[in-house]
Structure formats: C-alpha cells, structure tokens
Amino acid sequence: MKFYLVNGTFREDMPKGPAFQEALKAHHAYWAPHMQAGKVLFSGPKTSGAGLLILKCSGAEEVQKLIDEDPFVTGGVAVFEASEFSAFYKFPAAEQWFAAE
C-alpha cells in the first residue's frame, strides 16, 4: 500500500448556499465508507478552506479515481491534489494503520 496527502482547495466559482450544503452532505457520505474500510486515516477542513485527507491506497490510479468521484469534484466545489509520501516518523497509536496492507 502507498500513502497520500490529498490537499483540497475551493474553486472560485464554487456553488454557494443550499447547493454547497447539498454537496457537503454528499461529500461526507461519499468518504464515510472509505473511512470504514480503512483507506482514510483522517480528513477534515482547513482553516483556509476546503480540506485535507491522508489516504492509504494501492496506487495513484486508485487515489485519482477516489478524487474524481468525490461529490465536491463532480459538483464543482473543490479541486484536489494528491502527493504520495513515505511515513517515516509515526505516532505509536497510528502504527497499525500504516502497517496494515
């Protein structure tokens, strides 16, 4: 397995109001099963807008597919960029997540 930092940025032309709220609900619902499956270590909003995720996937193609199908992307709310990284220093409680295949 490989590890990815996924950085999201809101689009300047993103929907506002109720359309944004609907996209947000869909975005949360989309990532919930991936969290349950162990693909997501954490995710959350940045104070500057949009958010970050740490993912564990088989490779760049899987990460890109997850990003492309995110309702924030399909709904024109945000763009995401994934960067692969190696986990060298790890908090002991997170060791199991990083070690699992």
Predicted regions and their residues:
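Conserved, structured core segments of small domains
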Residues: 1-101
